[in-house]
Amino acid sequence: MDYTRGVSVEAAEEEEERRGWDSHSAGTCSSSYTDCSSCCSSDLEPEWLDRVQKNGELFYLELSEGEEEILLPLSPLEPVGVNHVRFNDSEAEILSEERKNVGKNSEPRFRKLAKMLKKKHTSKKGSAGLNGPTCPTSILKQHSSQKAGIIVRYQYRDTCLYVNPDRLPEGEPKEKSNLLQALIGIVHQSSRNSKRIERQGSQEASQRLSNQEKLVVHGFIPGSPAIRCGQILIGDTLVAVNDVEVHVENIERVLSCIPGPTQVKLTFETPVLCSGTALQNQSTQVQTSINDLAALVWGDEHANSQQDLQRMSHIVMYLTLRLDSDTSKEEQEIIYQYPVSEASHKLKSIRGLFLTLSDMLQNVTGAPIISSSLILNDELVHVSYWKENDKLLLISVPAQRFPLLQLKNMTADIVRTLKFMYSTLDRAFCQAENISRLDHFFSLFFQRALRVFSLTGIAGYGSQFYDACSSLLVENLPGVRWLSLPEDIKMEIDTVLSDLEALDFAELSEDFYEMRRLYMIIGTCLFYKGYLLSNHLPKEDLVDVAIYCRQYCLLTLASERIGQLIIWREVYPQYHLKQCGSSATEECTEPGGRYFLLIVGLRHFMLCTLLEAGGCTSKATGHPGPDYIYVDQVKATLLQLEMLDMSIEDRLSSAPNPCLSCADWFLPSTRDKLGNFTNSAVLSKLQTPPKKAPSPVSKRRLFAEAASSLRTRRPSPTRSSGGSDSGTDGAGESVGVVTHSTPDMARKFGRRESLGSGGSDGSGGSGSLLKINKKKYSLPNPFSSGSLRKNLSERETDDIYNTIKLTSGPENTLFHYLYFETLQGVFISPTHKEVEQLGGSIHPQLIKNFHRCCLSIHSVFQQALNQKNSKQSDSVACMDVAGFGPIKEHGVLFECSPENWNDQKKSPPTMSYWVVGRLFMQPQPQELYVCFHDSVTEISVELAFKLSFGMPL
């Protein structure tokens, strides 16, 4: 791996080390971005400034003070610092950097002042800039000063060599650097100053100079490991051996501690000179960064997923169909391949089969190939195809872990993300500088997908299981989870975001500098713990940003309490680029417009901002990095929204509405236990009809309030995997599929208010009632202002107790639901906490089957939409498609029983439930999925679907 850090040359290095704080503060408060002559002590540079790459991109992550202590010990995220060694008579004792610094008077003073200056990137071990990992701390301390003029940029590189101490010649005198030459093969010549001091006989001065003298490579021993590896250059400086800091004085003793034949890691330092105004080198290997990010998000599961990936046969190839017949170069059709491993070698060797299928089937059928399946080494493998012009993108994964429907959606998301990041697939795969970035992208992608599969196979129940089960569906939907909020909170958020988008601040206004602004904000979207709170972006831009955040686990990361997250990169939103190429909008778009994505996260909030350069703003040239004024304004916006933290948490922790039931409550034994509770006086009071029948006008008004309140469900933070091709995952389960269409007038389903009992919240027969004053409370439409929701404590004091539920009758039979609004690009479903409150032993299996079936039903709906939008089919042909109409409905019937049934005398109780999905075609396609008990009547099913009434249908 390569580490980069920009520092300046300054004399008197010895004095710098003794002065401690003075030298460190000088290096902290300055950077190679600006000349020190113009640097002002009162104008500190941002802590992320030295993380910006040459192409202007930035990925900077800093943990919060609490999370770094919890997460870092659980994962290999923290870069391994260079250790120090203290020799005794019999052994060498390794001292960590923290232990070595104990007792230094300058360290506490430095840390205290560093926190005051907010320069935590040099003192906090939890700071991790993901585009440039920090160097070992002891190495950084050697170069902490700054001076105007020449800038020295030190690049750190790790090289692994195999050494064998047993092959050393016996009886050879132990001269200085003998082991360095004999074992490693590096020749180092001492400086003239050290030789002069040795001749003068000053032992103390000689030892002090030896401790400071660097091990510069001056030559090599022929045939040695150093010359065979070809990665060590003359002029490099050896700074560490197996993460132990070395210098002239201790190198021989460190090498003598090598017990036998082994692989040794050598860390080299290479100086690079550049001008004082040059930007920092971007160049760090991001593989460590991506691994660090994955370890931060998933903890110990990260190591397990890496081991599984090494054994799993999977491959990503980008092939060209246009071959040069004049050259006989092997593998000339392969433009990109990941991974390069033995497991993927077999898939790589049959790439000719994939090319033939892609070309032949398109010539025969006239349509491009989408997917294929084959048996390879007694294992079923799915292959997904994506063809553009004369290039073909192939993704192959084992069918046991990735259902085919999931693979198709994953491929579409990958293509959309790469186009959002690089404009075209050719630009992404054909440019050499993007190869390492693509490796990291696909590494994180497969780790994330494999983790979902492993979590769904673990027996148990919890937020991780629900997150994994639901991600199979929600990660394949072109949308993001929505969280409905009370009117006052939503209006306050929208007002703050509108003020930011107006850019009417002093430094951002055109009148301040009498020049054009650098950027214009197209829109923003605000997330909290992965939930979308507010969106001011066009729908296509929102989906692009959401998929990008999903691919890099940013939504999951925001669920943790992060200290600071800053991401900046140029993006290519297809929605705006298509408008630029359209003749209808050509006069409205300035040529040369460029788009940039700025993501800033603080604690649980994450604000994504899409900016445009060009047009009415200044034209961007080169690769501009993030402007600190814009970053500071976004930070200030998030700090302003922090006061809403408690209100949003209360919203997430509130009781489910509409009420959900646990599947275990409907088992025969459980239903008997709940019989007395069902017939209680409280529920009888709830079922009592109103004394005075309302007028038709009041009926419509009353239903509008109830329906809109029922509609606005909180979005679920769920993400999961599985496969909905089969619905028989649990023990003793059988599935039956029922497909039917609904006529046009079925769209006008019964719009009646449903008030009654049931919906007890909890498990094992214990429940709590939602107490809602219907006259004072109704939930708002997620996309418009509505009535203000009251707190649970206030509702408990109301005189009238009503339980809002979607099904009629004495019992609430609704288990789960999901509503996908394609027009807005959002979906709504129960939250993690709402599902966790239900518990149960059968209910987790129900949740898993629900999302597996919804994925299959969603695929059927997409086929219907593709047929409708196909140019070859007109409206008459669309109506002839089986089951196609203004509303399309598919359902799956499950029968389940407890998996661990110990009573051999009695057969396990069974319970049947439906998973039904509906597609509304007009005015915009919308999808609604519900799961309910088999005992519900047809009218109750219609009432369940009024969950979508609050949305525009």
UniProtKB/Swiss-Prot annotation:
Q: Which GO terms describe its cellular component?
A: cell projection; cell surface; cytoplasm; cytoskeleton
Q: What PROSITE patterns does this protein's entry cite?
A: PDZ
Gly residues bias locations: 756-767
Just give the chief location class: cytoplasm
Q: Which Pfam families did the record assign? A: Intu_longin_1, Intu_longin_2, Intu_longin_3, PDZ_6
Keywords, A to Z, come to:
Cell projection, Cilium biogenesis/degradation, Cytoplasm, Cytoskeleton, Developmental protein
Family, per the entry? Belongs to the inturned family.
Q: What does this protein do?
A: Plays a role in the definition of cell polarity via the planar cell polarity (PCP) cascade. Required for ciliogenesis by controlling the organization of the apical actin cytoskeleton and the positioning of the basal bodies at the apical cell surface, which in turn is essential for the normal orientation of elongating ciliary microtubules. Proposed to function as core component of a functional module called CPLANE (ciliogenesis and planar polarity effectors) involved in recruitment of peripheral IFT-A proteins to basal bodies.
Please give the PANTHER family that the UniProt record associates with this protein: PROTEIN INTURNED
Identify this protein by name.
Protein inturned
- Which organism's genome codes for this protein? Xenopus tropicalis (Western clawed frog)
